[in-house]
UniProtKB/Swiss-Prot annotation:
InterPro entries: Class_I_gatase-like, GATASE, GMP_synth_C, GMP_synth_GATase, GMP_synthase, GMPS_ATP_PPase_dom, NAD/GMP_synthase, Rossmann-like_a/b/a_fold
Limits of the GMPS ATP-PPase domain: 203-395
Alphabetical list of Gene3D superfamilies matching this protein: 3.30.300.10, 3.40.50.880, HUPs
This protein's GO CC annotations: cytosol
Function of the protein: Catalyzes the synthesis of GMP from XMP.
Binding site for ATP: S230, G231, G232, V233, D234, S235, S236
Annotated protein name in UniProt: GMP synthase [glutamine-hydrolyzing]
SUPFAM superfamilies registered for this protein in UniProt: Adenine nucleotide alpha hydrolases-like (SSF52402), Class I glutamine amidotransferase-like (SSF52317), GMP synthetase C-terminal dimerisation domain (SSF54810)
Source superkingdom: Bacteria
Reactions performed catalytically: XMP + L-glutamine + ATP + H2O = GMP + L-glutamate + AMP + diphosphate + 2 H(+)
Amino acid sequence: MSVDIHSEKILILDFGSQYTQLIARRVREAHVYCELHPFDLELAAIRSFAPSGIILSGGPKSVYEEGAPAVAEELFELGVPVLGICYGMQLMSRHFGGEVVPAGKREFGHAELLAQGTPGPLFDGFFLDGKSPVWMSHGDHVSQVPEGFQVAAGTANAPVCAIQNLACNLYGVQFHPEVNHTPRGEQLIDTFVRKICGCSGKWTPGQIIEDAVARIKQQVGSDRVILGLSGGVDSSVAAALIHRAIGEQLTCVFVDNGLLRLGEGDQVMATFAQNLGVKVIRVDAEDRFLSALAGVSDPEKKRKIIGGLFVEIFEEESNKITDARWLAQGTIYPDVIESAGAKTGKAHNIKSHHNVGGLPEHMKLKLLEPLRELFKDEVRAIGEELGLPHQMVWRHPFPGPGLGVRILGEVRKDYADILRQADAIYIEELYAADHYHKISQAFAVFLPVKSVGVMGDGRTYEYVVALRAVETKDFMTAGWYPLPYEDLARISSRIINEVKGINRVVYDISSKPPATIEWE
């Protein structure tokens, strides 16, 4: 008997916080389905959604500002548990008659939370010896708690940092439990969705696959599907999932655009022939892509050109396939987050994504995106459940535009050849030194600037390569990976000696934010 994986669900209302998608990630980690919607979702839509619980996100506004974001008045009367985070807690407090004022001292960063009174079930196991480290990011605070609420915790600078109304199952926290900097925050969100909201945890890899297979069959019917295969985790898992659902109705098109990693084209063909048994058509399109990118240096324009040309080629290939009606993509949730504000339109558009931008308005193929609601590690878990090779599943993310956004400025064939070699050496050394699987994403970047060097008795004037390696749990925030100096020295020496055209290697130690993981 199939399980309805959507029967238990959490509604997350987005007030514009950069961390909102992390809340969804933590709910998913508790094996509970959730959806993210704008804060002004109508009450009728909320009732129709029938959430097991509601989470109100943080946001950049102040609740006492004119036109400040607010929720439907009756939301708190629906009888479902509500957790307000940061702005969400302030909104809840003000709604019930509490007071919110500008803080005398703003809190940003680490803080020590101190338990007060008798913290309710939300805080089971959250405090050790009455204390818990948390991450703060607020300029306002609750100065007077509403009637019916009790203070559960505070800090030296803000006496009211957690509130609770046990009779109504309403909770608020001023800190951010969704970020990694709050060590036991993940546990707190798990407690909310599992213990307080009563969700049992039906959102598991096996059940997600079963549900996705059924949905794909229903959506596609007897139509044929064409999928753009890159060899990366997302398109590989999408191919395996769709193939399980519709078998020979799927044809994968592997576009060799001249912007892939060293030897990647041959590896992709060999891997899928051996492991998936999927029909794959290889298209050599290097000249078309490099010609289209000639003279283009703006990263957004490059992304649009690459995305548009991919779709154009897919359409050409689909015309050769009888009854091809669908274009499948490996779009995942973080792609949608960065490009479209997670469907809310409330988040700032940092950069367009290859899978969700650059599509022609009158595309002849309908889009099939079976992974678009999944985070990266959910995709990996599904890939393993589907039996894909471990090395394929755990390969670092590679952008859809490929080396096109790892070559700063104009893309040229000689630049791509240099970068391919440098990147291959870098990744090879990370494997050899047992760093690769400890790093979330690592790659080389080609900088189209020259610097003076000395090799032998001669002067050189050659290009620069930057190395990037980051650690992250969710790709929403990331820290740079501290490679040992001796490893950096060895990698640099190999690249400079083995790659013609490079005489300088630098290491990127920027975190996200303020920098993004990719340079473009």
